[in-house]
């Protein structure tokens, strides 16, 4: 029987640090549900002490996710650990992940402590975390550049204090596979109580070595791998979990290990993270890139026609990538829509069937044939909308020629419908001028992207924008068969977020004034 490698996902913590705009609690919960379907063992949901938003995200995810263990990050500081425990206590079982720097440069120049102090702080942190849970992970930050004697000492002390998972991060992506595997092997050889903990690795991709280093560590005895979906993360990113998953599956006989992942959920999870994080996947990315299973060379195509095994070491179906058959039309009922959602693995509490069906009927009337990927796109977009949106687009008309475009709109502002028309340098510019006039918000667009979310001329188009308002970044998404309408929805998504933030700020200010 082969050993299990535990999969620890940090998309919602380390991965989110790379984003231009933070994910909402609702978006994080969507990703957490997808990770649960994928079969991830541990989900690091956030860093609770870092902000009220992160605290609420961790608490909400801990409340809803039942089949993956939820973890919260904390520094080796009592208040951090207390905050993590408070956010996680709604879960049936949870993990606290605490860390401290151990490399010479970090200890001397960042912490400005002696190594004795660092070991003592780490031990105290683990013992404090054990008051809340018997599942404690301890990380030696920048372990890849830590003198091996110091690393062995810290690992032994943390295990003695009660840590049952020891994480060895290559924090700055500095090591190479033989070197990193050697570090893990040395720990097994020199730390006397190493058998009392699972050794984990967390590799960054600054030199493009994160996946290779993680595999080298597994070969040396590590039995937990940390990473993110699509490899997103700070700087050059993290170890790509979809790549780790398929390496361990495809080469399981050679490596002698396995995971509990449901590999046919990989493609869908990757797409969701890409969409919600507004981070497109490069076409030649391993496993999930658009070209990952493409064969354009005549020699390769000839071989594939004769025997797929000539050039295909895994199938598209193994990651859940399959051609969607014609599924639904405007004559399909609610039961049919729900049946397709059930078949795709979505739980009833992940979407509102009434909202989804109403959006489905509108789309089916416009394009006739609705596919599973259309339903998924509609569901994700509906989950981004809030019923209490103050601004809603009721009507849109565009006239565009070779020089300028004219747009007229009707915008519901609370209970009042307002009309506006504007001329712009193209239909989107004209539409945005209308919205700016009616809402009164002065917004700077940092990024504007349009992507196809379906197939054919009548497929759905998605608009994604990053906007700057008073120094804060906001991410907006719009979805429609008309890309102009999608662009308007994306801007209104941002403006409604700003409007809600302004309302919250006003309430807080009134509370301060009444004290």
From Swiss-Prot:
Covalent S-S links between cysteines: none
Localisation: Cytoplasm
Enzyme Commission number, as recorded: 2.3.3.13
Pfam annotation, one family: HCS_D2
Record's keyword annotation contains Transferase: yes
Record region (Regulatory domain): 392-515
Pathway entry: Amino-acid biosynthesis; L-leucine biosynthesis; L-leucine from 3-methyl-2-oxobutanoate: step 1/4
Cellular component terms (Gene Ontology): cytosol
Subunit structure as annotated in this protein's UniProt entry: Homodimer.
Similarity comment: family membership: Belongs to the alpha-IPM synthase/homocitrate synthase family. LeuA type 1 subfamily.
Name of the protein in its database record: 2-isopropylmalate synthase
């Amino acid at each position: 029987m082969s050993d299990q490698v535990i999969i620890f996902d940090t998309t919602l913590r380390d991965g989110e640090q790379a984003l231009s705009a933070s994910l909402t609690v609702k978006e994080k919960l969507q990703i957490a549900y997808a990770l649960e379907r994928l079969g991830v063992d541990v989900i690091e949901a956030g860093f609770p002490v870092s902000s009220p938003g992160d605290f609420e995200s961790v608490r909400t995810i801990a409340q809803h996710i039942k089949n993956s263990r939820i973890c919260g990050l904390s520094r080796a500081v009592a208040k951090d650990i207390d905050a993590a425990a408070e956010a996680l206590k709604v879960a049936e079982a949870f993990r606290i992940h605490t860390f401290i720097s151990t490399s010479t440069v970090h200890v001397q120049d960042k912490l400005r402590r002696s190594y004795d102090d660092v070991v003592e702080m780490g031990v105290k942190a683990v013992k404090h975390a054990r008051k809340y849970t018997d599942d404690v992970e301890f990380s030696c930050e920048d372990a890849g550049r830590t003198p091996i004697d110091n690393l062995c000492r810290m690992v032994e002390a943390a295990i003695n204090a009660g840590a049952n998972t020891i994480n060895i991060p290559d924090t700055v992506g500095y090591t190479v596979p033989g070197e990193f595997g050697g570090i893990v092997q040395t720990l097994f050889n020199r730390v006397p109580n190493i058998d009392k903990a699972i050794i984990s690795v967390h590799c960054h991709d600054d030199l493009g070595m994160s996946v290779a280093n993680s595999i080298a560590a597994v070969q040396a005895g590590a039995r937990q791998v940390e990473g993110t979906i699509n490899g997103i993360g700070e700087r050059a990113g993290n170890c790509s979990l979809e790549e780790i998953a398929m390496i361990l599956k495809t080469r399981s006989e050679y490596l002698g290990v396995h995971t509990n992942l449901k590999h046919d959920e990989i493609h869908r999870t990757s797409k969701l993270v890409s969409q919600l994080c507004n981070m497109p996947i490069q076409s030649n990315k391993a496993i999930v890139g658009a070209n990952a299973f493409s064969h354009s060379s005549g020699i390769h195509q000839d071989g594939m026609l004769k025997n797929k095994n000539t050039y295909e070491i895994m199938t598209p179906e193994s990651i859940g990538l399959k051609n969607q058959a014609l599924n639904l039309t405007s004559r399909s009922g609610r039961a049919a829509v729900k049946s397709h959602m059930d078949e795709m693995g979505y739980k009833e509490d992940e979407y509102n069937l009434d909202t989804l069906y109403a959006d489905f009927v509108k789309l089916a009337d416009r394009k006739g044939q609705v596919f599973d990927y259309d339903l998924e796109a509609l569901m994700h977009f509906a989950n981004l909308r809030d019923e209490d949106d103050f601004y809603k687009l009721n009507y849109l008309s565009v006239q565009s020629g070779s020089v300028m475009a004219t747009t007229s709109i009707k915008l519901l502002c609370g209970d009042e419908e307002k009309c506006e028309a504007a001329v712009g340098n193209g239909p989107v510019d004209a539409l945005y001028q209308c919205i700016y006039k009616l809402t009164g918000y002065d917004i700077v667009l940092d990024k504007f992207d349009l992507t196809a979310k379906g197939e054919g001329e009548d497929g759905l188009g998605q608009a994604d924008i990053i906007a700057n308002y008073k120094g804060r970044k906001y991410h907006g998404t719009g979805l429609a068969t008309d890309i102009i309408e999608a662009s308007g929805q994306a801007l209104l998504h941002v403006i409604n977020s700003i409007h809600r933030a302004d309302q919250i700020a006003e309430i807080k200010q009134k509370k301060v004034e009444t004290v």
